[in-house]
């Protein structure tokens, strides 16, 4: 869930690509299986265009194929078309102190190219990033495990 008043869909995309290894196939780290695969599900054609364009740009920067599943949310009916929140103990799982001895997400330390360089025509102004480069310098995922071992606190509005 995100607040489009504070961040744009392309900010969410940037965080998504940079916060994990999207080339790891059916898993993350030592966790293997379809339930651990990377996936991004869209709700309209504009989101699909933005996801596909950002994927292509990030794939070029990584220099290897991205294996993230991209599909319409409405087509994802493995569970009867229903979406569920994770169990309470899985909410913010990696940010819980001592919850994991390792970070399975494995951020690659590669930043997504500037939006202007990959934005689909006609969508640049409507979906411009809202988060500043100062935000990304301070809060972007770092290579390896960037999960904090302290309570997960909201990012202050002053950092946005």
Regions found by a protein language model. Give the residues of each.
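Flexible coil/turn and secondary-structure edge motifs
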Residues: 1-160
